[in-house]
């Protein structure tokens, strides 16, 4: 397509040249100039066709626009001066083509400026730079200054030839891309050097696998010591709370399960089954047990006061003579001595029969008579005694045997035995 457009343009210029040759006389050397003009026009047309193609114009309109630009002698340096009115005068009426051409004109102008700047800067450094650096004396500095002044001025940037403009633009674009890549790589390297080194990733036990632990075999003194410590630690078993508090006794575990009688609760010594059966028979046969010799007159003189606390008895006597109550209380206090004298053993070992006394075969229906130790008082007094324990709780059970009750009703075992000893 491009070749066809070029051939068309060449044919047009050829016909115009033929007409001129017919009308005007041929001048010497005119054919050479015409040929050069044709070549330059063809190259200019090809450049403008390429320009319009890069701007996005279709090939047909691009050829027409290129011919119009060549006919109106539009140069590349005039691209920034183009506007909508000028484009309409040049025959470009399509609005989209106008906008595309104006945008691409700005881009091409920028590329030409970059190319001119790169060509103006020398590629290799001047050979006198090393000598200037090495020159330390005044003479060497004068020589270098004179050489700098005498050096020819730098040539102005020459307009590139139209034949090599496309190649130069492509090379400048490639150089700019390479320089941009180099700067990006340098910036990336600097960032990597300044960046903090990444922390090492932690390897978990699942990723690494199972550990193999080699236990000491006891070949060295240190390993033997470690094994001894482990054995000692294994020997110390952990004890429970019950082991640390002590084992429970059999009596503690069986106390609540077995029924206990009144005699076991009073602290009596365990007796045989025959004695217990005989005691129960005596209790059932006699409703009232009489105390033998409780109020008898003691043959011995008054003994010294017992170290244990005496039993305080509150007596209520119904009699016409009130002076006979005091001797009776004295005899009751003295009668407790007989119970204390026959206590050689501990109270827990005294049988129930001994503590109760011998049972009378025939219960007396009449009240007992109280006789005073004094010879002056011979009157009979009927005494009703009400015992009340006021002493300490730990008093002996034998102290409650010093009085005889005067009612003929049934007396329970607890009343006959007295309070429980602790």
UniProtKB/Swiss-Prot annotation:
Residues 144-166, 251-285, 299-324 are annotated as: Disordered. Residues 271-282 have a biased composition (Acidic residues). Keywords: Isopeptide bond, Phosphoprotein, Ubl conjugation. GO terms for cellular component: nucleoplasm; nucleus. It comes from the Eukaryota. Pfam families: DUF5577, SAM_4. There is a cross-link at residue 250 (Glycyl lysine isopeptide (Lys-Gly) (interchain with G-Cter in SUMO2)). The modification Phosphoserine is found at residues 124, 126, 151, 280, 306, 351. Residues 310-324 have a biased composition (Low complexity). SUPFAM superfamilies: SAM/Pointed domain. PANTHER family: DUF5577 DOMAIN-CONTAINING PROTEIN. This is Uncharacterized protein C19orf47. The gene is C19orf47.
């Amino acid at each position: 397509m491009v070749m066809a457009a070029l051939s068309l343009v060449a044919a047009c210029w050829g016909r115009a040249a033929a007409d001129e040759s017919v009308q005007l006389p041929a001048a010497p050397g005119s054919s050479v100039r015409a040929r050069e003009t044709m070549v330059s026009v063809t190259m200019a047309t090809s450049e403008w066709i390429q320009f319009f193609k890069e701007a996005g114009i279709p090939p047909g309109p691009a050829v027409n626009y290129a011919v119009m630009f060549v006919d109106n002698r539009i140069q590349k340096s005039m691209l920034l001066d183009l506007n909508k009115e000028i484009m309409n005068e040049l025959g470009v009426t399509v609005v989209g083509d106008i906008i595309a051409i104006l945008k691409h004109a700005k881009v091409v102008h920028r590329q030409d400026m970059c190319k001119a700047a790169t060509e103006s800067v020398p590629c290799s450094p001047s050979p006198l730079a090393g000598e200037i650096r090495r020159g330390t004396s005044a003479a060497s500095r004068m020589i270098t200054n004179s050489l700098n002044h005498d050096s020819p001025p730098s040539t102005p940037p020459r307009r590139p030839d139209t034949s090599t403009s496309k190649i130069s633009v492509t090379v400048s674009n490639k150089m700019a891309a390479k320089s941009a890549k180099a700067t990006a790589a340098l910036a990336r390297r600097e960032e990597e050097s300044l960046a903090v080194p990444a922390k090492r990733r932690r390897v978990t036990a699942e990723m690494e696998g199972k550990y193999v632990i080699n236990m000491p075999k006891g070949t060295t003194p240190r390993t033997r010591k470690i094994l001894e410590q482990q054995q000692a630690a294994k020997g110390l078993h952990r004890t429970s709370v019950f082991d640390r508090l002590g084992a429970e006794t059999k009596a503690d575990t069986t106390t609540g399960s077995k029924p206990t009688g009144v005699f076991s609760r009073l602290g009596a010594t365990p007796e045989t089954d025959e004695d217990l059966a005989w005691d129960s028979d005596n209790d059932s046969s006699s409703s009232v047990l009489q105390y033998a010799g409780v109020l008898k007159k003691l043959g011995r003189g008054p003994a010294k006061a017992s170290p244990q606390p005496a039993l305080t008895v509150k007596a209520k006597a119904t009699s016409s003579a009130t002076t006979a109550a005091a001797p009776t209380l004295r005899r009751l206090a003295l009668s407790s001595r007989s119970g204390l004298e026959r206590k050689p053993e501990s109270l827990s070992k005294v049988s129930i029969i001994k503590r109760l006394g011998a049972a009378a075969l025939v219960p007396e229906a009449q009240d007992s008579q109280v006789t005073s130790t004094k010879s002056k008082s011979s009157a009979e007094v009927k005494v009703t005694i009400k015992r009340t324990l006021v002493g300490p709780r730990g008093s002996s059970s034998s102290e409650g045997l010093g009085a005889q009750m005067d009612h003929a009703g049934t007396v329970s075992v607890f009343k006959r035995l007295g309070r429980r000893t602790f």
